[in-house]
A protein has these predicted regions:
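Short, small-residue-biased leader/transition segments that mark boundaries at the very start
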Residues: 1-6
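C-terminal boundary motif of the adenylate-forming
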Residues: 67, 72, 105-129
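Adenylate-forming
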Residues: 41, 75-102, 131-141, 159-164
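Conserved C-terminal "lid"/linker of ANL adenylate-forming enzymes
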Residues: 111, 119, 150-187
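Conserved ATP-binding/catalytic segment of the ANL
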Residues: 12-18, 26-29, 33-88, 105
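Generic structural signal for well-ordered beta-strand positions
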Residues: 30, 71, 77, 94, ...
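Residue-level signal for inorganic ion chemistry
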Residues: 74, 103, 123, 166, ...
Length: 187
């Protein structure tokens, strides 16, 4: 519903303080990299010109690595990270973070990661074992429960974003100090 749209909204950049642009031929409909520029944007990495050159272009635009769209009134919507985007054989861009957000809000899912395996989308899922146990779901029943969750999820995503398989994990995903999943370990 409409509430889902606003949950992904990032807001507008501040006039006179920061400017933003989307590197896209059609920034309203086609996601592109979000770039920002302004007094409050860094001028570079300390004593690291190579890293600076990788993210700051000659005109001073910081390439954030975030992919998004922007409405005509300037409201930004972040779709996901450029590095995590999955490009399908038919040319569709899949932002796994969007699918993961939906999956993580479903019953019995503690955390998830969507990855490409061959030409299939697989959701790696660490179940909420506390809730699973509380509800009396056995280890033998859990795959069938997750299959029902997969089918429900697939009703909420675009056809090209549908998950082909859920793979259960017995342990939590390895995380960075910021508590982000170390995605690179699971690709």
């Amino acid at each position: 519903g409409l509430g889902d749209v606003y949950k992904r909204q990032s807001g507008r950049t501040l006039p006179g303080i920061m400017h933003s642009r989307i590197d896209s031929s059609d920034p309203v409909n086609v996601p592109g990299e979000i770039c920002v520029k302004g007094q409050n944007v860094m001028k570079g990495y300390y004593k690291n010109p190579e890293a600076t050159q990788a993210v700051l272009d000659p005109d001073g635009w910081l390439h954030t690595g975030d992919m998004g769209t922007r409405t005509p009134d300037g409201t930004l919507f972040i779709k996901g990270r450029y590095k995590t985007m999955i490009l399908t054989a038919t040319g569709q861009n899949i932002y796994p973070e969007e699918i993961e957000a939906k999956l993580n809000n479903m019953q019995y899912v503690a955390e998830s990661l969507v990855v490409e395996r061959g030409r299939s989308l697989v959701a790696l899922v660490y179940p909420d074992y506390e809730v699973v146990d509380r509800d009396g779901i056995t280890t033998e029943q859990l795959p069938a429960v997750m299959e029902a969750i997969r089918k429900e999820l697939n009703k909420k995503v675009a056809p090209y974003e549908r998950i082909d398989k859920i793979q259960l994990r017995p342990t939590e995903f390895e995380k960075t100090p910021k508590r982000s999943i170390k995605r690179f370990l699971y690709n």
